[in-house]
């Protein structure tokens, strides 16, 4: 009993001693981990200027809070490595990353095992802005370059890293089609040790993208996102290279004039992704995710729809209502599909059906859109609702009866609508290509000219035209 009491006393003394040591070490590290240290580290890695308002580390909790972060183009202050107090405020830039606060929690014990285990990264109020030119190059690209100067001294790694990135860009431009080589901006080998991340959460944010060629603007607002269960081992990417993605927000496409709105989509994305390509270690250039377009999302102006409507004037003249194509297009219900993204090229991984205004649009597999220069190739079909289709058939018969008589009306109507009828509904397969804002659209089936259809109808039964005239 006495031995147990003595042991307990010793244990308490040891725990007190450990607590004092941890507190002392925490105080020491807290004094070392400040904003200048973090700024210096980041500016030594990339071609950026970093501004931070405050840093609050806690060794006991394994937590660091970083507030008021601004990342933008590099300037002379960053090149010289001056401390924050010696710098003037950053010049406002259209290319920027601003974050109100980042909270980072790690498992300190795992660091002694050469493993980085991150419990959570919480990003609050993200503000990201950049532009994309017609070649697919974005204004963030230069920020990912290695810095030429670090603390006023020429970076010995600059030429090697710069050349590696330039070679990757040349390979990217020389390759043709959709199969572009890997982006050399980041490699898994730059991850210092096997890394796991329980969760990365974005609490509110917005992204603004300027498309230089068209002058259009893309805004992603009300952003909520998460990456969970990240598992990356740079030495074993075949088995440790995955993460679970979750993202939602409103995507709005605006014209060069700020009041011109093309579309507004409420989106959700989720699924398992591979951050790196296993063979090369570079960022995976071909991300595939499950995307849901929410009910009520709308397309205010769609050039493809307008051009498609112009090719159907013969059918419109006989009774087909094309206003459902030209009017405001509203998504009828939540629609989920797989979408691939490779070097700013969006493609349908599988057929993409969407119900709009009671009608169905289906984009065929491998249809694609280059979001950088608006080039596209889309194979699709537009199927009118049963109500509109039946009304078109009835109006067509009435119109043709007045024009050529009832005896020929049915035959002519059949000649006009048979090529574009599927399962009792008017079904228009079509192809769209070229500039998305000025597309070349053509139906994939041959449409009958009204005059030719009337001639063919009369040939089938010459006497019917006379009978039709007598019936009037």
Task: List where the protein language model places each region.
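Extended terminal
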Residues: 2-15, 277-286, 306-307, 311-472
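Extended lipid/amphipathic-ligand handling interfaces
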Residues: 42, 52-59, 87, 99-116, ...
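Short, hydrophobic/aromatic-rich segments at coil-to-beta transitions
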Residues: 200, 240-247, 344-350
């Amino acid at each position: 009993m006495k031995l147990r009491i003595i042991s307990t006393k010793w244990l308490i003394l040891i725990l007190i001693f450990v607590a004092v040591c941890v507190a002392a070490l925490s105080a020491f590290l807290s004094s070392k981990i400040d904003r200048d240290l973090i700024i210096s580290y980041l500016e030594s890695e990339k071609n950026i200027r970093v501004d931070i308002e405050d840093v609050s580390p806690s060794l006991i909790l394994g937590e660091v809070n970083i507030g008021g972060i601004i990342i933008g183009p590099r300037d002379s202050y960053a090149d010289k490595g001056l401390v924050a107090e010696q710098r003037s405020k950053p010049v406002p830039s259209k290319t920027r990353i601003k974050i109100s606060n980042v909270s980072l929690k790690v498992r300190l014990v795992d660091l002694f095992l050469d493993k980085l285990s991150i419990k959570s990264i919480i990003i609050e109020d993200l503000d990201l802005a950049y532009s994309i030119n017609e070649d697919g190059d974005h204004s963030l690209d230069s920020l990912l370059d290695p810095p030429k100067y670090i603390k006023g001294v020429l970076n010995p790694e600059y030429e090697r890293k710069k050349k590696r990135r330039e070679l990757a860009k040349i390979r990217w431009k020389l390759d043709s089609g959709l199969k572009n080589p890997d982006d050399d901006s980041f490699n898994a080998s730059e991850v210092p040790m096997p890394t796991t991340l329980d969760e990365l959460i974005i609490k509110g944010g917005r992204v603004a993208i300027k498309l230089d060629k068209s002058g259009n603007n893309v805004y992603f607002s009300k952003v909520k996102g998460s990456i969970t269960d990240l598992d990356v081992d740079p030495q074993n990417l075949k088995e440790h290279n995955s993460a679970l993605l979750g993202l939602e927000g409103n995507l709005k496409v605006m014209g060069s004039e700020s009041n011109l709105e093309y579309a507004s989509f409420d989106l959700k994305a989720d699924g398992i992704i591979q951050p790196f390509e296993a063979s090369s270690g570079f960022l995976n250039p071909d991300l595939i995710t499950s995307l849901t377009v929410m009910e009520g999302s709308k397309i205010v102006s769609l050039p493809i729809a307008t051009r498609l409507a112009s090719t159907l004037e013969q059918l419109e003249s006989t009774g087909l209502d094309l206003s459902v194509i030209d009017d405001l297009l509203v998504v009828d219900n939540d629609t989920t599909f797989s979408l691939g993204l490779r070097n700013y090229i969006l493609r349908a991984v599988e057929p993409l059906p969407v119900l709009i205004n009671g009608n169905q649009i289906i984009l065929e597999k491998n249809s694609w859109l280059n979001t950088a220069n608006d080039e596209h190739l889309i194979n699709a079909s537009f199927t009118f609702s049963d109500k509109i289709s039946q009304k078109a058939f009835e109006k067509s018969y009435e119109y043709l009866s007045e024009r050529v008589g009832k005896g020929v009306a049915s035959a002519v109507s059949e000649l006009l609508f048979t090529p574009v009828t599927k399962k009792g509904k008017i079904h228009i397969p079509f192809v769209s290509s070229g500039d998305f804002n000025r597309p070349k659209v053509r139906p994939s089936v041959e449409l009958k000219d009204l005059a030719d259809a009337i001639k063919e109808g009369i040939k089938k039964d010459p006497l019917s035209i006379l009978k039709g005239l007598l019936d009037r």
